[in-house]
Structures are given as structure tokens and as C-alpha cells.
């Protein structure tokens, strides 16, 4: 199975399945001397772990305690591969026994079977969101590397269930269960999720990620453009179905005079480019958005087929999120951190004489 590794110089490989013994990541290419311990990684992981307190989140309880098995000595990275893992403690495979022979609508069951001829039906196996543990653990390492260069990355809920934030105050993100920067829409979001949950259905939304302090010059034309890699990173997350940078799709309806970010001695007058021009960072804030689809595991009865192609109906009763938001927010943040850390190292490799 290819496609488990991401990055060029700062490379990460995730491993593990939803109901296997454990999950984790191997990070290769992290420079030596970086301060790193399990507590620091855990702080970021706690934002994505199951049972995090939101009414939109799964009832599955996983501590997801990070264990660093290699690549760190006396609190510093050694430059060798870093392995971070956690054990799966609360997997209940019996919840999937009755539907093991059915293809779940909206899931990768049917496509994994088509590709490999075999699939792990316990919670989606490798296609489960449990895989994102490794992404976030690696993102925590990347975030520390970026911090040393004055770069910070933050993600928040821009929209949930069709209800959109009207103002952005990142100081409010950690103050509510949905990770939303606008407290005035919290009641509406709560009502929306509650109603959908009562029906046994699910909702999607939009996550916005911003990166500040990114220097001009990151990105490798033409096929490794910074925005292309950010788009790939976000699209690689299972629930993400669309990505835009800066003005994004709105730019298609603009005139050139409105779309262009005029340049002044103090910098850019606007940021429709989202901090990236010609695939290279321009020194402005990087802004990306990810469209997150509704969780496909729902209690409402739907039509499907079994593994023999015969018609069947299915209603999924396991412990599932009502929305991937807000748990997916930190996954989006982590993926942008990985891209920026990789491109930062790539830029340093060609500019060390300057």
C-alpha cells in the first residue's frame, strides 16, 4: 500500500488502523536539537482525541497518550527518525459485526475492496479518522520547528451546518465547544447540531487555517508550489472535499482590479492571494479553507449492496461524530504545519549562503 508518506525533507509516514493494537507516525528529517517531549505533543493531540466534550463528537473514549519511542534524547531531537504512537484502548469491533458484509454509503469500503480485494471492516480500518493521530503528532513537532522561525499556525471553525461565523476573533476559539471564532453564532450552531443529532443524521462545515510570520520565498515552482502542497495536504484528510486559498472561488467572480493585491511600501493592501503568489509565499498571512463533508456514518436507514452486490439496507449504530468539526480543525492545522516545515527546510537548503 503506497501513499502513506508525506513531505520531501520533513517526511512523515503514518501507520495503524482504527481497531488495531495502535496507531502512530514516523518522522524523518527533523533537525537535531529541537526541544521535544511527550507533554508538548500531547497538548496538540488532546484537541483531536475522541470524546473531547463537543456535542458533535463521538462517544468513543480514547486517551491517545503519545509515547515517543525513538529520535529524542534528554528532551532534544537527535536527527534520527522519531516514532510517536498510542494504543487503541476503546475499540469495540463487535459494533461492526452485523454490517461487516455491507458497503457503507459515503465510506471507502467499496473502493478499498475494489483496489485491494480485502478490507478491514472494523471501523474503516486504515481509512478511519483514527489515522489522523499520526498527522497531529507530527504536526506538533513541525509546529515547534516553525515556532523557532517565528511562524504560527491556527485553525478554527468558519462554518458548521450552514451557520457561518460573521466575525473572526481567534481569542474565542478555545472558549467554546465548536472551536468557532464568533461567539454570537454559538447558540445557532448548538441548535443545529442538536436537531441533526436527534434525527440520527450528520453535518459538515468549513475549517479556516491561517499561518502568520511565514517569510517570503517558500515554495518550489512549478509542481511543488506552496499552495499546491497545502491543497494536497488538506485534501488528503478523509472528510475534506474542497480547498481554497485566499479569495478562492470568489476570485472567479472578481475583476482583475479587485482581485489584485496592490503593493505599498508597507506591504500588500489586501490579501486575496492568501499569502501566496506564483506558488511562493509573499510574506503576508497565508489563509486556506477546507470544505468538510458530513460524517457518512448515520443512524438513518439507507440503501446499499452487500459484498456480493445484492441490494440491502443499512443503519449505522456505532459511536460516531455528528460532525468532523471541531476535531478535524487541529488535523487541518497540523497538515499546514507539515507543509510549511518541509518548505522551510527546502528553502534553507538553497539559501544557506545568504
From Swiss-Prot:
FMN binds at residues 126-128, 278, 293-297, 319. The keyword Acyltransferase does not apply. Pfam families: Chorismate_synt. One of its GO terms (cellular component) is cytosol. Its cofactor is FMNH2. It catalyses: 5-O-(1-carboxyvinyl)-3-phosphoshikimate = chorismate + phosphate. GO terms for molecular function: chorismate synthase activity; FMN binding. It comes from the Bacteria. NADP(+) binds at residue 48. Reduced FMN (FMNH(2)). Pathway: Metabolic intermediate biosynthesis; chorismate biosynthesis; chorismate from D-erythrose 4-phosphate and phosphoenolpyruvate: step 7/7. Its EC number is 4.2.3.5. CDD domains: Chorismate_synthase. GO terms for biological process: amino acid biosynthetic process; aromatic amino acid family biosynthetic process; chorismate biosynthetic process. Keywords: Amino-acid biosynthesis, Aromatic amino acid biosynthesis, FAD, Flavoprotein, FMN, Lyase, NADP. Homotetramer. Belongs to the chorismate synthase family. This reaction introduces a second double bond into the aromatic ring system. This is Chorismate synthase. It comes from Desulfosudis oleivorans (strain DSM 6200 / JCM 39069 / Hxd3). The gene is aroC.
